[in-house]
Amino acid sequence: MVYNVLKYNIVDDEIEAVIEYYESLSISLGIRAENEMLSSLLHLKNHAHNYLLLSDNIHRRIPVKSFPYMFVYSIEDDIVIVKMLFPQKDDPAKLWERLIS
């Protein structure tokens, strides 16, 4: 099944902030971060069910290869809804706070 992938508006801001951070370290690192995040999002179009369910059994996560971030999303019918780009180093309690707010 091919899914439509939609993102909350804040996800674009989070992606841009991560790219800017890595570009401040190295332009090539910023480009690589952007490519890996886009690759993760594109992978959801065909493989959304392949990733780990979180403990609420509603949301899933897909890691961003080579970077300490993950996208958190849910699946509704044929739509993947990306809700956040979450730093894996952050306290998981923050993830749940953001999901319920």
Residue ranges of each PLM-predicted region?
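A short, surface-exposed loop/turn module that caps and links secondary-structure elements
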Residues: 39-64
